[in-house]
């Protein structure tokens, strides 16, 4: 019989598991991250490209990640290269854009761009076709609000953007 004297209290705080988002029913998926907000996006990319094959309408995925400098871009560079490599044998086109927001110049490297991402350009490009686009943003509130405003503006122009976001604050 267990003793009640040796109790251990455990507190778990989430989220845990996978995001319950039905992005597989969209032709175009745009994933936008700021800083450590890349974490759930890596999970989504792995599910799309390395997970169990399931029925999907996805034709293209654009992943945009903004970090201050080259150091932070290395956090998940191995995963990015791996996902990009396996996407080449997929019918789904993967485009990866990593923005070094404080960099004036960018060292030579796969996926790297200097300055803040031009979300207007990226979201407008993803919604060129009449097919609905799924937009997921995870990052600081300012980034999420900016992407939301652009998506709303595009919706007013008749483009369809289904928007989901996660924010973090410290």
Predicted regions and their residues:
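Reductase modules of NAD(P)H-dependent flavoproteins
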Residues: 1-22, 57-170
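Beta1/beta-strand and adjacent pyrophosphate-binding region of the FAD-binding site
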Residues: 27-34
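Generic hydrophobic alpha-helical scaffold/packing signal
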Residues: 17, 30, 42-49, 80, ...
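Classical protein tyrosine phosphatase
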Residues: 34-64
């Amino acid at each position: 019989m267990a003793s009640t004297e040796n109790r251990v209290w455990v507190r778990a705080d989430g989220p845990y598991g996978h995001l319950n988002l039905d992005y597989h029913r969209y032709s175009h998926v745009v994933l936008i991250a700021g800083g450590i907000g890349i974490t759930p996006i890596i999970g989504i990319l792995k599910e799309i490209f390395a997970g169990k094959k399931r029925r999907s309408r996805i034709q293209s995925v654009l992943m945009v990640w903004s970090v201050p400098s080259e150091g932070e871009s290395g956090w998940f560079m191995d995963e990015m290269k791996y996902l990009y490599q396996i996407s080449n044998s997929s019918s789904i086109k993967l485009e990866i854009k990593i923005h070094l927001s404080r960099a004036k110049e960018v060292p030579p490297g796969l996926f790297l761009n200097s300055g803040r991402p031009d979300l207007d350009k990226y979201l407008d490009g993803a919604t060129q076709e009449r097919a609905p686009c799924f937009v997921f943003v995870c990052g600081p509130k300012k980034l999420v609000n900016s992407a939301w405003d652009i998506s709303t503006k595009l919706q007013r122009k008749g483009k369809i953007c289904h928007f989901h976001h996660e924010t973090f604050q410290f």
